[in-house]
Amino acid sequence: ITLHIEESWATEIIPERFTINPLKVEEEIQIGKYRILPLASNHKGDYKQEIPLHYLFFNGKVSWLYGTDGCWLLNRTWQILKEHTFDCWIVDCTIGDEHEGDFRIFEHNSLPMIRIMAKTFYKQGILKDNAWIVLTHLAKTLHPGQDQLETKLDFPFKVAYDGYIHII
């Protein structure tokens, strides 16, 4: 088994059970038919030197950004994303609507923050016109129930749940 993890965690894993592949920010790797670009996220890690990561996936046909545990985007990540167009954005949406003042806003996105970023992604051509935004990492205390949230949201938003599969 190969474990692909942020490089500061690599020394914490017992290597006799795994092959360790330390991931470095902005250094693309290949796993099977996928190219994956780790990007820095805006979140506090557990280790002093840790850089929490978002991931941009490519396979020659589609690409998507997977970004949980992070809020807004770091400028260095934005500069890289501007060079790409992707088919889907899977994003941390810990905080729902009407929770202004919640302390988690410095490490996790709120739905209003995502709406602002989404407008920019579409306007700048980073998200394709038909691209979905999948909301994940939702705090159950900061959102209505699944059905209520889905009813409130239209394209481009989908609400993830345990076992959710999104076909691009």
What are these model-derived regions, one by one?
Residues 1, 45-47, 142-143:
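Short, well-ordered, mixed-charge alpha-helical segments that flank or form enzyme active sites
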Residues 1-21:
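Active-site HxH/HxHxD metal-binding segment of metal-dependent hydrolases
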Residues 6, 41, 60, 94, ...:
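Residue-level marker of positions within ordered structural domains that often coincide
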Residues 12, 27-28, 56, 124-125, ...:
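Short secondary-structure boundary/capping segments
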Residues 16-22, 41-52, 88-91, 121-125, ...:
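Short low-complexity stretches enriched in small and charged residues
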Residues 17-19, 33, 61, 130, ...:
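A generic structural signal for alpha->beta connector loops
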Residues 20-77, 162-168:
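Core dinuclear metal-dependent hydrolase active-site scaffold
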Residues 72-164:
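Cap/insert and terminal regions of metallo-dependent hydrolase folds
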